[in-house]
Amino acid sequence: MSSKPKSLEIIGAPFSKGQPRGGVEKGPAALRKAGLLEKLKETEYDVRDHGDLAFVDVPNDSSFQIVKNPRSVGKANEELAGVVAEVQKNGRVSVVLGGDHSLAVGSISGHARVHPDLCVIWVDAHTDINTPLTTSSGNLHGQPVSFLLKELKGKFPDVPGFSWVTPCISAKDIVYIGLRDVDPGEHYIIKTLGIKYFSMTEVDKLGIGKVMEETFSYLLGRKKRPIHLSFDVDGLDPAFTPATGTPVLGGLSYREGLYITEEIYKTGLLSGLDIMEVNPTLGKTAEEVKSTVNTAVALTLACFGTQREGNHKPGTDYLKPPK
């Protein structure tokens, strides 16, 4: 494991303006209510709670071309970037609870200010790499990667609210896992830029063990560096995470999701985490909401050392009779 002190800071990001459905701003509260913090405190990490950010709507936030709520999304991300950078400066792992996935702009930007050599593992049914020119919906939760990529700088007009963003990762610094709903413009971008991805076809063909081996070899083979895991719960199949805004059939299993997060923990390099797109208002039943929230909690815990094989406290002799 890494030698830096093991501590993490939870940042609630109750924000929904990157997409049209209300309720995703209730994600952080649902994860807290499910006992996420208490459970994290049982791991070897020192857990701090930053609380929830209070995002203020920008009045008269008219669309830019077809891009919706640009100033509100830009401002929320600018605020989040500052908080994440502060957490990183203090040597803690930033854990951002979304909120919609447009927040990755701020989360990854803030992380990169302190660790410019970071790499990104993006688990999602979607690439979220539409640009303001290729998007058909105008929803910014489908565009965060385009703002972060150096290779796309200058490929689309300046969006109001985003003047603070400096692209901070290259095409070779990101790997996608779980893709199965990619727009033509996005497919063109990932192919043209040579971005590494494991769609569900590759996951089916190789198995998740090989996928993670290849992911680490590609991102960390030459040099160990901080990992930012941006996890959209729709990366998993809707059988496990139905309460989310854009579910797509045929996704990762619960087991594959846990394997991804367990393996990332084992590298000792996880430095930033996003748990995104839990929308407790979209479950058809209480059971669907519970399943989605509990799955998101389990994925988060696995990132910090909770193992399916079980855990025990180091240095404790469990066979000693109690005094």
Curated annotation (Swiss-Prot):
Localization terms from the record: Cytoplasm; Cytoplasmic granule
GO molecular function: arginase activity; metal ion binding
Chain positions found as Phosphothreonine: T281
Name assigned to this protein: Arginase-1
Assembly mode: Homotrimer. Interacts with CMTM6.
Chain positions with N6-succinyllysine modification: K17, K75
Cofactor(s) listed in the protein's UniProt record: Mn(2+)
Family to which this protein belongs: Belongs to the arginase family.
Amino-acid positions noted as binding Mn(2+) 2 in the UniProt annotation, renumbered to this chain: D124, H126, D232, D234
Phosphoserine: modified positions: S7, S62, S72, S163, S217
Gene symbol of the encoding locus: Arg1
Pathway as given in its UniProt record: Nitrogen metabolism; urea cycle; L-ornithine and urea from L-arginine: step 1/1
Binding site for substrate: H126, T127, D128, I129, N130, S137, G138, N139, D183, T246, E277
The protein's Enzyme Commission number: 3.5.3.1
Tissue: Expressed in macrophages. Expressed in precursor and mature group 2 innate lymphoid cells (ILC2s). Expressed in lung tumor-associated myeloid cells. Expressed in lung tumor-infiltrating dendritic cells.
One Gene Ontology cellular component: extracellular space
Induction / repression: By T helper 2 (Th2) cytokines such as IL-4, IL-13 and IL-10. In tumor-infiltrating dendritic cells by prostaglandin E2.
Chain positions recorded as Mn(2+) 1 binding sites: H101, D124, D128, D232
Organism, scientific name: Mus musculus
